[in-house]
Amino acid sequence: MVQPADIDVPETPARPVLVVDFGAQYAQLIARRVREARVFSEVIPHTASIEEIRARQPVALVLSGGPASVYADGAPKLDPALLDLGVPVLGICYGFQAMAQALGGIVAHTGTREYGRTELKVLGGKLHSDLPEVQPVWMSHGDAVTAAPDGFDVVASSAGAPVAAFEAFDRRLAGVQYHPEVMHTPHGQQVLSRFLHDFAGLGAQWTPANIANALIEQVRTQIGDGHAICGLSGGVDSAVAAALVQRAIGDRLTCVFVDHGLLRAGERAQVQRDFVAATGANLVTVDAAETFLEALSGVSAPEGKRKIIGRQFIRAFEGAVRDVLDGKTAEFLVQGTLYPDVVESGGGSGTANIKSHHNVGGLPDDLKFTLVEPLRLLFKDEVRAVGRELGLPEEIVARQPFPGPGLGIRIVGEVTAKRLDTLRHADSIVREELTAAGLDNQIWQCPVVLLADVRSVGVQGDGRTYGHPIVLRPVSSEDAMTADWTRVPYEVLERISTRITNEVAEVNRVVLDITSKPPATIEWE
């Protein structure tokens, strides 16, 4: 399979900024911030060999933070040869300390730790030029660099870090003890941009137009003269993936919308109307609700449900191929897999499998298509930007994320037709009230979850009730890698709760999930 790494355009996956991951919780965030500076980046594990890194022909390296001390047994080591590749290098936190140690600087246990917001004093240099001399940054370290390597200028300090930043501009090397990638460092994005554009001399080539053009060429190369099928879920990911592929191969793409009976109210009609109107694509709708419900009967385990839905989804495609292609063959299956999907499904060295994604780990072993995943290196905001570049309407590109398995993973317990009707009704009320309150642009998504295996005692009218709770999970995020619960106004929550408990049978309690990600994922299952 031809991967995005084979595209040869400036600062696209052919020549990335590589974020070397030393175990940081923010490695993916660093990659995203680099992309915000319009330079492509990708994360690789610190265990990658020099040969592997050299083969990627990186235009720059960013050494991430990590939880270890450089003196701890088994701590990740920085191969000094990495600094001799002739490419610009920026070290962050642990990466900064490992870089200092490898170049002959001194890293010591100073006895002063800095965790959280810290005052940084800028002492000069180019990395922080034109920025405030005293500024807040986010620190998370116990060890500190006490002496910079020979030939490096100390350009910042803090109470617990005598050398909080250093640079050797002529060698295109720099490092910072703090975390420029987090929002708690107000000038962090400017520092990253200065390294990328001034130290590394990189242009701002990672733009929606360039991304779209590169991905279209990638698809043409991979599919050639073949035919493809794309599964539409109604969401932005599959819609943008389909639009890209159609732009590449035209009417050799057949879009299939599988109505698995796990959709929200009105979604089938919306897909058939909005997507076809925007693209003119060939669309076939498969009514498979009964098949999915039969397969899910008696299954309550989240992973079991995900894998069943993924398996049935592919089977529905195989049936569509036989029925609608009139003897032709379709060798390729287009999916809207994103970078966070791949990461959460254990798609990189050293990553743990959090849950099987419908687009990734839920596919059957006997898959009969070659996968085409043009978006698998993109974050959600980049997908939306590409969609707008392709001319898709806001009704599609601004739609809140909705999981491929649909309401099947928003019912905690067995999925039945009655439970789906209950959840679908509650979900429609929530969406209606959030839209009426003008909150759609403030909320990344708001899963509505039915606790079908839980009964809650209540009083309605003069009688005792024994109904199910509904959970509201409004979250704010930029890319789904991390998320915070959204502070929905109380009066909006009150309207939602009142309407659900009055209008939805079997529900007598509405609760609010106020957990961030991490530790919780956005979806309950």
Swiss-Prot record:
It is an enzyme of class 6 (ligase). Its EC number is 6.3.5.2. It comes from Mycobacterium tuberculosis (strain ATCC 25618 / H37Rv). The lineage of its organism: Bacteria, Bacillati, Actinomycetota, Actinomycetes, Mycobacteriales. The keyword Lipid biosynthesis does not apply. Gene3D superfamilies: 3.30.300.10, 3.40.50.880, HUPs. The active site is at C93, H179, E181. GO terms for biological process: GMP biosynthetic process. Residues 16-205 form the Glutamine amidotransferase type-1 domain. This is GMP synthase [glutamine-hydrolyzing]. It catalyses: XMP + L-glutamine + ATP + H2O = GMP + L-glutamate + AMP + diphosphate + 2 H(+). ATP binds at S233, G234, G235, V236, D237, S238, A239.
